[in-house]
A protein has these predicted regions:
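Gram-negative bacterial Sec-dependent N-terminal signal peptides
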Residues: 1-15
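Extended, polar beta-sheet/loop recognition surfaces of beta-rich domains
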Residues: 15-35, 46, 54-57, 74-75, ...
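Contiguous beta-strand segments within globular domains
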Residues: 60-77
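Solvent-exposed serine/threonine-rich low-complexity stretches and specific carbohydrate-binding patches
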Residues: 89-101
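Short strand-edge motifs at loop-to-beta-strand transitions and within beta-strands
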Residues: 103-105
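Preference for solvent-exposed, low-hydrophobicity sequence contexts
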Residues: 154-200
Length: 200
């Protein structure tokens, strides 16, 4: 069973609402062109409609630290589809899966600050077929330090469950995603990969 986590892991230090606005001031052009959203997916097409959700604080900002772990929740798909992830100057294509899962990536080096996008690579395309999940990686305002510490610790706990299954309801509640419960099965397999060094 998934180890107990607070029902709301952000209750320790709730991120203040102005956080995203502060991030926008630090890099106004890029974040204005690319608004943050933790969930991706469309409403049409078997592939494009697949749910993709980042495990990041509710404000969409994540400082992954010196040993980055990135987490993505994938919904069910009628066809096996690879998962595309890209950030700063790097891009990864994870193996195709059909069923819903929790994917975790342990990276070999710190990630350069910038946007992180994830989406299903439909028919081998490397451009999003629908709005992607989009978060901002890198150090944020000092007020977000506690939330990022909780996020990193929770990702490490999840990494310790690689190859097992986790309770979906508990996972979603911990990451403020309870509204997605009806789109996912009761448990999710934890699929872990350690990409080879490349780019960021």
């Amino acid at each position: 069973m998934f180890p107990p986590l607070p029902l709301d892991i952000w209750s320790i230090a709730p991120p203040p609402l102005p956080l995203v606005a502060q991030a926008n001031r630090s890099s106004p052009d890029r974040t204005r062109r690319f608004p943050l959203r933790r969930e991706g997916g469309g409403t049409r097409g078997a592939c494009a409609a697949r749910l993709v959700a980042h495990l990041v604080p509710p404000d969409g900002l994540l400082d992954p630290g010196p040993q980055p772990i990135l987490g993505v929740i994938e919904g069910d798909s009628p066809v096996a589809v690879p998962l595309a992830l890209r950030w700063s100057d790097d891009e990864r294509i994870e193996p195709a899966r059909r069923g819903a899962s929790l994917r975790l990536l342990l990276l070999s080096a710190p990630i350069s600050a910038g946007l992180w996008e994830s989406f299903p690579a439909c028919e081998g395309n490397t451009e999003p077929p629908a709005p992607p999940a989009r978060s901002l990686l890198g150090p944020g305002p000092r007020s977000s330090a506690a939330a990022n510490g909780v996020a990193r610790n929770s990702l490490r706990v999840l990494w310790s469950r690689c190859g097992e299954r986790v309770a979906t309801a508990e996972l979603l509640a911990a990451w403020d995603y309870s509204h997605l419960a009806d789109r996912l099965p009761p448990t999710l397999p934890v699929v872990c990969t350690t990409p080879s060094p490349s780019g960021g």
